[in-house]
Amino acid sequence: MTPPVLLYGHPPPTLFREPEGAVQVSPLDPGGVDLAETPEDAFASALILAPPGRLEREWVLARTLQLLPPGAQVIALAPNDRGGSRIAPALRAFGCEVTDEPRRRHRICRTLRPAHPVGLDTALEAGGPRLDPRLGLWTQPGVFSWDRPDPGTALLLGAAPALKGRGADLGCGIGVLALHALESSEVSAIELWDLDRRAIACARRNVAGARASFHHGDVRRMGQGGGDLDFVVMNPPFHDGGREDWALGAAFISIAARRLRPGGVCWLTANRHLPYEATLGEAFSSVHLRAETGGFKVYEAIR
């Protein structure tokens, strides 16, 4: 039986049709396979929508070349404004011969896996998980705010009081807000949710103890149950595929309200320009602006 195609992300259908039987390995796909744990020679070829960050992109390309047999085809593409022009140089640095074609505001690179690629270990180490001494936390290139404290999160940490009861950190990243919540001995349990498998893996290493549970999944598809939480903390995403999408944050707000019991509290931080006030007002009985800076704001919303 011919091995399947390795598929990373979802290339635009106007450029490529996803191969039948392909195995999705993007960390942003909860139903996918973990590329870091995949055995070698499990795939016949690869089709990659390359991520925008340099270290993340080079890690994906290096790991793909490590897994494929010599001579296997690799097609990697990205939009022009999200690193497309940097794919070919990265592949050439690994010892690949590359064709680089512009099409529909993308760059499409094709290569065959060389018999003896070079520099893979260096790229895998640079783009892999690490304990960041500045953060004091495990992190990895590609996850939210992976190499620096997020100012919106910091503002929320300074504004929120000690919490209690059962809670959730929606879009938890590497677990900063959950860690703060668990400083209170009155917090009995907290769920950590994130779409990014790498973020959940880091959060598992950062947030210890039986009170925390971890969920790799799309918060918007959490299910219909609700009314079981005393608090929610969150810094909801507002980008989808590199473009601003205010509906993402609005969906998180609605789901937070659904999960909270009457009287439960949601602490939310967001960029100042995001228009969440109307959604908060519709979903919660009372809403208070608790902190604000030039770029960020923090709300306390009571169910």
What positions do the PLM features span?
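SAM-dependent Rossmann-like transferase core, predominantly class I methyltransferases
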Residues: 101-164
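Conserved short alpha-helix immediately C-terminal to the canonical SAM/SAH-binding motif I
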Residues: 199, 252, 276
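A short glycine-rich, Lys/Arg-flanked "PGG" loop and its adjoining helix->strand segment in the class I
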Residues: 59-70, 250-262
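Conserved SAM/SAH cofactor-binding pocket of Class I
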Residues: 1-31, 150-234
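Conserved proline-anchored active-site loop of SAM-dependent methyltransferases
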Residues: 45-55, 170-177, 229-242, 256
